[in-house]
Each structure stands twice: as C-alpha cells, then as structure tokens.
Amino acid sequence: MTTLRIATRKSPLALWQSEHVADALRQHHPGLEVVLVPMSTRGDEVLDRSLAAIGGKGLFLKELELAMLRGEADCAVHSLKDVPMELDEPFVLPAILERGDPADALVSNLYASLQALPLGARVGTSSLRRQAQLRAARPDLELIDLRGNVNTRLAKLDNGGYDAIVLACAGLQRLGLEARISARLDAPEWLPAPAQGAVAVECRGDDARIHSLLAVLDAGRTRVCVEAERAMNRALHGSCHVPVAAFARWEGQDLFLQGMVGSASDGRLIHADAHGSADDTEALGRRVAQGLFDKGAAQLLAEL
C-alpha cells in the first residue's frame, strides 16, 4: 500500500483542511494510505506581534517546506491566502481545491452588524486589509490587534476584550461555527484577501509521483480566479505588510476582477476592476494593478 504524508499546522482549522484533503485523496485513490504530520510553525508560536512585524505569512510555510525537503512529508496543505506570491524552488501547487466562502465575517455577542456597533467600539483584527476597510466604513472604531487561531480569537471576544472581531467566513464554517457569524462582509462593498477561502496543496516539483496523486484534486475554475487575484497582488508587490484585497468571479466565459489598496491608518481606499480572458489571468491581474497605480496606489503604498 502506498502512503502519502501530509505536513500540516496543528491548529484546528489547519487540521480540518488537511483531513479534508486526505479524505478527497482516499476517495480518488482507494489504495492510498494518507497520514497527517502535524507541525508547529513560527507563525503559530509568536502571537504577541503582528505577522508583518515578524516576517509575514510565509512563516506558516517554512517548517512544512523544510519537512518536505528532509523527506519527512510528501506534501503540505495551506490556506492559499497565506502562501507567498512566489514559491521557493523546488515547490509547486499541483492542487487548489474548490473554493469555500471568500467573505469576511463580523462576529459579536451584542451587535448584529458593523453599522450597529456603538461609537468607539473595540474591534479585533490584525489584518491590515481588514483594518483599512473598517476605518473607511467606521472611522470612530478602536481597532486592536488580534492574533491566534479561530478558537483563541473567539475566546478573547467572549472574555470581553472586544465588542466585535473580524474573521474569515470559511474558517468558521469549516469548524462548525457558522452560527457565530453576526454579519457577512461581502464583495463588492468589502473585498477579501487574494485567494481567501481556497485551500492549496504544495509539493516538490521534482516529485512526479506525488504531483500526479495530488493533481486530481485541482479545481480548474477556482484556480483561474485565485491566480488572477494573486497576479494582481504580485504586480503590486503585495504581502501581509500591505492592505491589498482582490476578488475574481466568473461572468460567462470571462473573469471580472476587483482590486483594492488601502491605508490602515486613515481608511483611504483605492479601487479598480477589469474584465478579462480566463486564458490570461496574469494579464488581467496586471491590468487591475495598473488601474490601482493610475489612481495613486504607489503613493499610498509608499506611505506604509
């Protein structure tokens, strides 16, 4: 019997996503034994500083990639929004699964919407993208850093540290916590992180056997959308240091891509969008990025 080892972070959401991939692989390959290799990453361990301050979301990947290089794991499962725009050699993404809910969620025990929050309410999020959009919608809010896994963040809310917090809908839904969603924060008014809601599987590009096993999970229509979003982010040189948002959707045979760059300090937002061919997501991403630059995104980004 062939065995495939999946490196994964230890958080409940990461384990859910990895088990979801494992179940799909078992269905496609009935003779395949799939085991999880849970690991802790620096991004999980350092919770008293923002991701931007300690090196970015790539910290969630490095230990898992090292495990693959050492031969301790065959692949790794990630939230695609945490994956850097450029992968280090020799890594590739042979599978991007069908996208979950891309929206953000406002979670509060007392208030049913962003508009219902009282003047000066305390809202928890460490995402610069979320902070920028919150400041644009409600300049009066007090925004407070919030790190940790989904359950940790909810516990901090429940302990009274915040009036509300902002999380990804997909994470709450995958953990059976959809009832905690007070209000959805949806496109086009509120844009998600590039590739939010999508799960990706990473492996070594020189491992043809593993690549072949994983490729059957790839959802082509999802891949096209998230590649356009990531192409825009790449053209902007975006990272977790930068408040960048993007969302692509199918319109007939073409894609419609919306992009945003914002300021977490004062809530200035710059938007651009474009239609384009699904056959050239790179060009579509660059076109929306150029639209943002034409409206002053370079100056805004230079201030960060």
From Swiss-Prot:
Catalytic reactions of this protein: 4 porphobilinogen + H2O = hydroxymethylbilane + 4 NH4(+)
Any one Gene Ontology cellular component term annotated for this protein: cytoplasm
Cofactor comment text: Binds 1 dipyrromethane group covalently.
Annotated keywords: Porphyrin biosynthesis, Transferase
Keyword Ribonucleoprotein: no
GO BP terms: protoporphyrinogen IX biosynthetic process
Positions of modified residues (S-(dipyrrolylmethanemethyl)cysteine): 240
Keyword presence, Protein biosynthesis: no
Annotated GO MF terms: hydroxymethylbilane synthase activity
CDD domains: PBP2_EcHMBS_like
Domain of life: Bacteria
Cofactor: dipyrromethane
Pfam families named among the record's database cross-references: Porphobil_deam, Porphobil_deamC
Pathway annotation: Porphyrin-containing compound metabolism; protoporphyrin-IX biosynthesis; coproporphyrinogen-III from 5-aminolevulinate: step 2/4
Record EC number: 2.5.1.61
Complex and partners: Monomer.
PANTHER family referenced in this protein's UniProt entry, alphabetically: PORPHOBILINOGEN DEAMINASE
UniProt cross-references to NCBIfam families, sorted A to Z: hemC
Family: Belongs to the HMBS family.
Miscellaneous remark of the record: The porphobilinogen subunits are added to the dipyrromethane group.
Stated role: Tetrapolymerization of the monopyrrole PBG into the hydroxymethylbilane pre-uroporphyrinogen in several discrete steps.
Name of the protein this chain belongs to: Porphobilinogen deaminase
Organism: Xanthomonas axonopodis pv. citri (strain 306)
Lineage: Bacteria, Pseudomonadati, Pseudomonadota, Gammaproteobacteria, Lysobacterales
Gene that encodes the chain: hemC
